Regions:
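Alpha-helical transmembrane segments
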Residues: 12-15
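C-terminal motif of bacterial Sec signal peptides marking the signal peptidase cleavage site
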Residues: 17-20
């Protein structure tokens, strides 16, 4: 587990200049120092403690699985950077969730209760330019029972995934796992639109359930000459169970940072930022006795920001025809126009009756698996790799249809609930070529990508668009089933992912590897 400690005592002007040049945009001012900010807060009678950040990687999955029975179906190309907070002296620490995101220093945790009179403040330089940056908080566990008398539960039972989405905390059966979003995220587009810049810029984030705390923190920042446009508040909704006692809700906050322009390999600026973010985390609370909190509105089913998309369903006939052409190319033709028995359509998780949307999950005690409105999620599960199976995933390419800034096509380990392998959208471009799949319209808007144990020897059929799925513990080991998942992130010109009901679900076709 990578522990990340940051102390921004003072940000030199020269660093500001270098970072600004990388983004071709000069920031308006240098950020404040930790000591300066802390001193002003304490003058106002606030208690202040400093936390740190911790990178959660695929390698950390086994420990998380021991604690929570899940690895959260992560996106392997965007490891979580988790906020690790110092516990308040009177805060209950649930031993059942300690280490949920890896070991932390004594007195610190990546999951925490919320004092109704507190705020978490994160500030500093954002990372180098990338396809996506987002900061979001989640309800992690709660006391109670999940509901089974609803259409969502019935659907999930039907596909055999009820233990994924409806479950108790393994070592505390009085609580259920949630991981439900609590707000619309503060992502790079939101930050750009409000402040005029995001990547490589100094910005401030307040996470709080209390309007009074938001106002007080902002007043201190204004006193330090911070412009209001550079401050972003995540409003934790009032329909959570606040408090520091054992019965209160448990929360988590994290950062997603995806597909940096510099490639993200070791030694790059983005790699360094991800492993040691130039951010500071402070936990702040009001010490006034008996002050009533001014809570924010509840987070309800219709609260998430409304999303748009280009309607892709006009491409359905072309998709079905492409599935036919792919099958013919393999000499394993479909039995009918829908390729029944061999091809299966992905499931859209965000529309009814699945409803993988934070407040809708919370209403029935469902685990939303760290959902976000910044992407659409479609999946299909129940596939093995032990008997020479070859799978073709055929779908629309969101970057070509106008529904995504970037696309992710992944393979999940169903047992560990782990995002094991991933194909970035740039590697899907050109995979649906008319030379290989003739007679299909709009091929430039599609992809065809293959998954099997060993791609070697299949080049004439896959044309190089193939991923060899490893049989290691943290990939898809023998006997473990896999799930395919497609994510479309951030519709161009908007600040959210696509309205998933307008996204044409991909299809997966199963073939048998040809005899040598």
């Amino acid at each position: 587990m990578k522990k990340i400690f940051v102390s921004l005592i003072l940000i030199p002007v020269v660093l500001t200049t270098i970072l600004a040049c990388n983004d071709h945009k000069a920031p308006e001012r240098v950020g404040i120092s930790v000591d300066q900010f802390t001193a002003e807060l304490k003058k106002g009678g606030f208690e202040v403690a400093q936390g740190y950040f911790q990178l959660w990687r695929i390698e950390d999955c086994p420990k998380s699985f021991e604690v929570m029975g899940t690895c959260y179906f992560n996106n392997p190309t965007a490891p979580y950077v988790m906020a690790v907070v110092p516990y308040w002296p009177n805060e209950f620490v649930d031993p059942a969730t300690l280490g949920a995101f890896g070991a932390t220093d004594p007195g610190y945790g990546a999951t925490f209760r919320f004092d109704p009179n507190e705020a978490i403040v994160i500030f500093g330089f954002l990372p180098p330019k990338a396809a996506y940056f987002g900061l979001q908080s989640y309800l992690f566990t709660q006391k109670g029972e999940f509901q089974t008398n609803n259409a969502t539960y019935d659907l999930i039972v039907k596909i055999g995934a009820e233990e994924v989405f409806f479950h108790k905390v393994p070592h505390n059966q009085a609580r259920i796992g949630s991981f439900d979003s609590l707000s619309n995220s503060n992502n790079n587009v939101v930050i750009d639109r409000q402040s005029g810049g995001s990547f490589n810029q100094f910005r401030y984030f307040i996470i709080t359930p209390d309007q009074y705390m938001d106002k007080q923190v902002r007043q201190v920042l204004h006193k330090l000459s911070v412009a209001d446009k550079d401050i972003f508040t995540e409003r934790i909704p009032s329909n959570m169970r606040f408090g520091l006692d054992a019965d209160a809700d448990d929360f988590a906050s994290g950062i997603r940072y995806s597909m940096p322009d510099d490639g993200g390999k070791e030694g790059t600026a983005s790699y360094k930022w991800r492993h040691n973010p130039t951010l500071t985390l402070l936990r702040i609370r009001d010490t006034q006795p008996h002050r009533l909190s001014r809570l924010y509105p509840a987070w309800e089913g219709d609260s998430p920001e409304r999303r748009t998309a280009v309607d892709e369903w006009y491409l359905e006939t072309d998709l079905n025809r492409l599935v036919q052409r792919v099958s013919q190319a393999w000499g394993q033709a479909c039995p009918d126009p829908m390729c029944s028995g061999r091809a299966a359509r992905f499931i859209d998780t965000q529309t009814p009756d699945f409803n993988l949307v934070g407040p809708k999950c919370d209403n029935i005690g469902m685990d939303c698996l760290a959902d976000t409105q910044d992407a659409s999620y479609q999946f299909r599960g129940g596939y093995g790799f032990d008997n020479d199976e070859v799978y073709a995933v055929v779908g629309t390419l969101g970057t070509a249809t106008g529904n995504a800034t970037y696309v992710s096509l992944g393979v999940n380990n169903f047992h560990l609930r782990l995002g094991a392998e991933n194909v970035e959208g740039t590697k899907l471009v050109g995979s649906a070529d008319p030379r290989w799949y003739p007679g299909v319209n709009n091929l430039g808007k599609f992809y065809v990508y293959y998954f099997t144990r060993h791609c070697e020897g299949l080049e004439e059929l896959t044309h190089g668009f193939c991923l060899s799925v490893q049989d290691t513990e943290l990939a898809i080991p023998p006997g473990v089933q896999a799930t395919f998942v497609e994510r479309d992130y951030m519709v161009p010109g908007t600040q959210r992912g696509p309205d998933s009901k307008l996204v044409l679900p991909p299809m997966v076709i199963q073939f048998q590897r040809p005899a040598q």
